[in-house]
Design a protein with these regions (language model features):
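Glycine/serine-rich phosphate-binding loop and adjoining beta1-alpha1 elements at the start
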Residues: 1-94
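Short, well-ordered alpha-helix to beta-strand connector turns
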Residues: 24, 174-175
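Glycine-rich phosphate/diphosphate-binding loop of Rossmann-like nucleotide-binding domains
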Residues: 68-173
Length: 178
């Protein structure tokens, strides 16, 4: 049993897929198991967000010699991850959380569990805080149309060539990116 990541035809997995075919191995790519509305039934995104956020704070603590956290794999679940994180004292950092998908929302569970204050994009970019804060951004927060129009996500996905990155404004004030 393994997550093959072959349906997207990534070049680095080509040899793996060829070996599976040569050996006549029965393969179910879990990314293709969907319901009647074509929504994936198996996904690990939420857990990737939970563990990724925890590991981000673990790395932050190590890098700045602030605290040491156990590896996520040695703990029993999300509640224990949050309990360990809440024991730490964070400086007044500003955290950018990108996305509202499964990974982003899993990471948000950690931030909210730690009782880190969520702020608006405008406030994040313009204010200083005396506590750790985070902002959750989506594609139109960090991309803008070249012609200056303000449209919607559908336009962004249909016409990505009409947009340029505006993420730099977050890098000027953020300490951590998740």
């Amino acid at each position: 049993f393994f997550f093959s990541h072959t349906i997207k035809k990534q070049p680095y997995n080509r040899k793996l897929l060829q070996a599976i075919l040569e050996k006549n191995i029965e393969l179910y790519d879990h990314e293709t198991i969907v319901d009647a509305t074509n929504r994936r039934l198996i996904g690990f995104g939420r857990y990737a967000g939970i563990v990724g956020a925890y590991n981000g704070f673990r790395a932050f603590g190590i890098k700045y010699d602030l605290f040491t956290l156990a590896k996520a794999e040695t703990l029993s679940g999300k509640d224990e991850l949050i309990t360990r994180l809440k024991r730490q004292t964070l400086p007044n950092i500003k955290i950018v959380l990108s996305g509202h998908g499964k990974v982003g929302m899993g990471a948000k569970e950690i931030l909210d569990g730690m009782k880190i204050k969520q702020v608006s994009v405008t406030d994040f970019l313009s204010k200083k805080y005396s506590e750790p804060v985070y902002v959750q951004i989506d594609v139109l927060d960090y991309n803008k149309r070249i012609d200056g129009q303000v449209l919607n996500n559908d336009d962004f996905y249909k016409n990505p060539q009409d947009y340029i990155s505006d993420f730099g404004r977050f890098t000027k004030v953020a300490d951590v990116y998740i």
